[in-house]
């Protein structure tokens, strides 16, 4: 790279730049971008995935927080008519400004691990615009997203992601694929928003509240952890055993608890 455009990864931005050509190719094949599609890449870094995504002929918008990377990306992709760069924080990005039809946007990114969970929740609030998402994340985070009830990985992230999306843990990526190498293993996840929610809640914000309350003290029984929102009778009325711990409940049970709370608030 031209010395004028050299850039060191910044710890405060959680930057680890992907450089393994084999992994890059595998990710691009999983995304399977095509001409006529609209993609959004979050945190393009030095453009490892960007090059291949643009080569598909798809329209590509990228959001990059690091101001020092902006001239590097602008210089590298200046001749690409299907490239548009937004400098800013993806956590504050308004996806509606892209003007895409419902269920059409493909979102991709090697997400900074220090903001990956809040960023996923921000994206879920725009799930109606999104066709699919492919992310590089900390392996542990992907395992939590894809977890099922009954284990230690099942929690707020699993439930809220699976409420909105089908989750596929595609493959793992070792530290050597990055510069500098992170201290943890990574993984690629595919999230596909449901066309029809399998367990629609009356109020998804109440579902988030119920799930957060339940897992604040995950080792306690529901009867104890939920007492600020629902008493024992209300839990039973939702068809849920109050003596269970939160990790023993599936998504459908949490939706029933949230709906019980919604009914209680309207009474």
Curated annotation (Swiss-Prot):
The keyword S-adenosyl-L-methionine applies. Its EC number is 2.1.1.182. S-adenosyl-L-methionine binds at residues 16, 18, 43, 64, 89, 110. InterPro entries: KsgA/Erm, rRNA_Ade_diMease-like_C, rRNA_Ade_Mease_Trfase_CS, rRNA_Ade_methylase_Trfase_N, rRNA_adenine_dimethylase, SAM-dependent_MTases_sf. SMART domains: rADc. Specifically dimethylates two adjacent adenosines (A1518 and A1519) in the loop of a conserved hairpin near the 3'-end of 16S rRNA in the 30S particle. May play a critical role in biogenesis of 30S subunits. This is Ribosomal RNA small subunit methyltransferase A. It comes from Pseudomonas putida (strain ATCC 47054 / DSM 6125 / CFBP 8728 / NCIMB 11950 / KT2440).
